[in-house]
A protein has these predicted regions:
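Bacterial N-terminal signal peptides
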Residues: 8-17
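Bacterial N-terminal signal peptides that target proteins for export
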Residues: 1-8
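Beta-strand-centric surfaces of beta-sandwich/beta-rich domains
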Residues: 24-266, 271-368
């Protein structure tokens, strides 16, 4: 779990597993807000592609400053909704969002919400939540929540993977969001924010596998045709964010990015997001030093279970610390997985489509 969504991103899930979190929610005076897409959307992929990314402006009609305790994306078409991301619309972007969704039918948004410029999601992180297979209600841990101001709105980005439609039948979708919140006034709940940690993806065709799209340049041209030009530039943008040379990419089955923090915060939970070639992910604080701590370790990544993991003990991070995200992949899965095996071999980069890849670590934290 839109920046770029999306990446796909995925996204942040704070799916509660502890009974004390559930009990705490029951004791709170919660107000429920439910909102669905203004109009039903019939997914379609551009230029003979297989993926449709669509953003919708939604107004939950929140009447007071609040703190979100739980939020749930409820897909109407579970078979081909690949993932969804819920963004907060910032004051700076509300006019643009209203203009883009005048008809209530949303707008194409490969790579984030499309608001605020390229890679804005990775820079400003206006995420609230995300959904992917295996996730249910996104419930913050006991004592924590996400601030949401009176009158604020969501942008809901939905990724439709049309390859997954049952029998190839595509129907209209009108998914919805259900949110539970407490008033900010008088609340003792600590406020969470989201930090995103992307890494470049550069996967060459496996040994012995050939085809026109095994050439990186041709693969990026194809990516632009299936999505848009901005999406094809994301690989270079993310490499630059990670301090790597975007003009000299190095193919590898391991993706890594180090990010130096410029503020203090405390990590409460972490979640992984990759696509179908992903094998493992780690998020490491201060790697290679005596202060090294493992924030997230997913040794056997499962696309159908991208739930966030609440840390046993919150971990403080200070300005100047380094956080590394590291992902590993198996490109041979393109020839083995039913959903990918019929597609042409290709050099795989960061991209929004189900047949592209991502390496995205997501952290939920409180500001110090």
């Amino acid at each position: 779990m839109k920046t770029r969504a999306l990446i796909t991103l995925i996204l942040l899930s704070l799916l509660a597993t502890a009974t004390n979190a559930i009990a705490a929610e029951k004791r709170e005076v919660l107000k429920t807000y439910s909102v669905k897409m203004v109009k039903a959307h019939l997914p379609s992929a551009p230029n003979n592609g297989t993926d449709d990314y669509r953003c919708f402006l939604l107004d939950p009609k929140v009447t007071e400053d609040s703190i979100i305790r739980s939020i749930q994306f409820i897909p109407q078409r579970k078979d081909y909704v690949h993932h969804a991301i819920i963004f907060r619309v910032t004051d700076a972007n509300i006019s643009e969002a209203i203009s883009r969704d005048k008809s209530g039918t949303g707008w194409p948004c490969f790579g984030g919400s499309g608001l605020g410029g390229m890679l804005s999601s990775f820079v400003t992180s206006p995420w609230i939540s995300s959904w992917a297979p295996g996730r249910g209600i996104d419930l913050s841990p006991a004592g924590y929540g996400i601030p949401f101001k009176k009158g604020e709105r969501f942008v809901l980005q939905v990724h439709y993977n049309l390859l997954a439609a049952n029998g190839g039948k595509i129907e209209t979708d009108q998914s919805r969001i259900v949110m539970k919140a407490v008033p900010s006034k008088g609340a003792t709940v600590k406020q969470l924010h989201v930090e995103l940690f992307p890494a470049p993806v550069e996967l060459a065709c496996p040994s012995g596998v050939t085809g026109p799209l095994c050439d990186r340049k041709q693969a990026l041209i194809d990516l632009a045709g299936r999505t848009n030009n901005a999406s094809a530039l994301e690989a270079a943008g993310i490499a630059a964010l990670c301090g790597q040379n975007p003009f000299k990419p190095i193919a590898s089955t391991t993706s890594t990015c180090d990010k130096v923090m410029n503020s203090n915060f405390t990590v409460i939970a972490a979640a992984p997001h990759m696509h179908l070639l992903g094998r493992s992910m780690k998020i490491i604080l201060n790697p290679g030093t005596s202060a090294e701590k493992l924030l997230l370790n997913v040794p056997n990544y499962n696309f159908d279970d991208q739930s966030a993991i609440v840390l046993k003990k919150p971990v403080p991070v200070t300005a100047g610390d380094t956080i590394r995200v590291q992902c590993t992949y198996d490109p041979t899965l393109r020839q083995k997985l039913p959903s990918l095996s019929k597609l042409a071999p290709r050099y795989v980069t960061w991209g929004e489509g189900s047949s592209d890849e991502m390496c995205l670590g997501v952290i939920a934290a409180t500001k110090s």
